[in-house]
Amino acid sequence: MKNEKKKSGIEPKVFFPPLIIVGILCWLTVRDLDAANVVINAVFSYVTNVWGWAFEWYMVVMLFGWFWLVFGPYAKKRLGDEKPEFSTASWIFMMFASCTSAAVLFWGSIEIYYYISTPPFGLEPNSTGAKEIGLAYSLFHWGPLPWATYSFLSVAFAYFFFVRKMDVIRPSSTLVPLVGEKHAKGLFGTIVDNFYLVALIFAMGTSLGLATPLVTECMQWLFGIPHTLQLDAIIITCWIILNAICVACGLQKGVRIASDVRSYLSFLMLGWVFIVSGASFIMNYFTDSVGMLLMHLPRMLFYTDAIGKGGFPQGWTVFYWAWWVIYAIQMSIFLARISRGRTVRELCFGMVMGLTASTWILWTVLGSNTLLLMDKNILNIPQLIEQHGVARAIIETWAALPLSTATMWGFFILCFIATVTLINACSYTLAMSTCREVRDGEEPPLLVRIGWSVLVGIIGIVLLALGGLKPIQTAIIAGGCPLFFVNIMVTLSFIKDAKVHWKDK
């Protein structure tokens, strides 16, 4: 009994350092919000301007890695001895479900406005050229390129899981082939794990910081409850309590059902927007945007605007590449676990095709709807953002649709469920990563899960208190920097080990 307790307890070397670091940063921020904003702007400017090029090269190199996996010597290697655990249709659907978070609904609805109002390549704001490139850039940031980078890491984790039979819950476990067991399980591995956990905590906090205002703005629209920071804090607290109840009462099956409901409701809501917003325009705009993407792809890949210094690639491309980097390990572990029994080529093609289709549908439908509302002068989005904030502008893009009350109820339920499942996933992932010897099928300790959900909630509230998108963007970029190196090490470790255990034929 005593040994069992020790077995399922926290791992101090990866539990306390992230807790202390994040706690201190939150305390310093709350002490002086104005000073924190000054630091945030300085960090954002330094990382994006000095190191933005590194993120762009990272994505390009990982894209070449994808081609190597698909057409190279390992293409037909199978990730595990068993047949695929899920049918291809179920597999693709699970991938789509992983894309329908509230943060995705946030960016999908409003991103195009920023691209049109502050366009790249020196284009005139709100011009025809800016509108033509707007959706194309969304398809670039949320298309095959980032999913190709994820597929490389997913193959790496699937290899360690199902071929090498390793129990990987932290990135240091995968580094044994690269740095040796002594370093992977020693101080070096501990530092790597702590980088991963601190970055992941901030990433999850930013997702919560994006999702919460959508729910509270829905409540204001539906029930007339004024949206305030206090209301945001109350809603986050309610979610944390709900998550604790679900975990304590063994209602995880209910959470999984809620996740399925979220996916089906996403299909329903997107279908509704597609039909009533203007299906023919959406398809024409999408087709045109794919052409624009293909025409400008080389420049987009390497665009740093070093001469014009307009700030577009730093504010968006580097930010999104950091977003993809920071979520890469967590997402790739999930995608690897549902891909047992598939070949390397199947996993790479399935991810790029299935997940690109998911994100392109989301961004095309929601972005086109926002553009139409702007062009028809139904919404004055700049005024809404200036007077009420970004979340209100997003809500109004949904409220402007026919049957607005029913539409808003659907959007409210979708955002609420998406955030409940987000907090549940956050607490589970962090608890699994900071506990000792928790195996698949076992639950990490209740108090640890609740503790992490509380900390993620606090970060979300702190980011909301800072106001605007810049703190959220900076948190992602700062967290993405250390993960940039961790992802590269995991990739190199896989390549080195595969050369031994998957000998070229």
From Swiss-Prot:
Membrane-related topology note: Multi-pass membrane protein
Keyword set includes Membrane: yes
Reactions accelerated catalytically: 4-(trimethylamino)butanoate(in) + (R)-carnitine(out) = 4-(trimethylamino)butanoate(out) + (R)-carnitine(in)
Pfam families in the cross-refs: BCCT
Pathway(s) annotated for this protein in UniProt: Amine and polyamine metabolism; carnitine metabolism
Keyword annotations of the record: Antiport, Cell inner membrane, Cell membrane, Membrane, Transmembrane, Transmembrane helix, Transport
Localization per Swiss-Prot or TrEMBL: Cell inner membrane
Taxonomic superkingdom: Bacteria
Segments passing through the bilayer: 10-30, 51-71, 92-112, 143-163, 195-215, 231-251, 263-283, 316-336, 347-367, 403-423, 446-466, 475-495
Protein's GO biological process: 4-(trimethylammonio)butanoate transport; carnitine metabolic process
InterPro entries linked: BCCT_CS, BCCT_transptr, BCCT_transptr_CaiT
PROSITE patterns the UniProt entry points to: BCCT
Subunit architecture: Homotrimer.
HAMAP family membership: CaiT
Family recorded in the similarity comment: Belongs to the BCCT transporter (TC 2.A.15) family. CaiT subfamily.
Matches recorded under NCBIfam families: bcct (TIGR00842), PRK03356.1 (NF002887)
PANTHER family, per database record: HIGH-AFFINITY CHOLINE TRANSPORT PROTEIN-RELATED, L-CARNITINE_GAMMA-BUTYROBETAINE ANTIPORTER
Protein name (database record): L-carnitine/gamma-butyrobetaine antiporter
Organism encoding this protein: Salmonella typhimurium (strain LT2 / SGSC1412 / ATCC 700720)
Gene, per the UniProt record: caiT
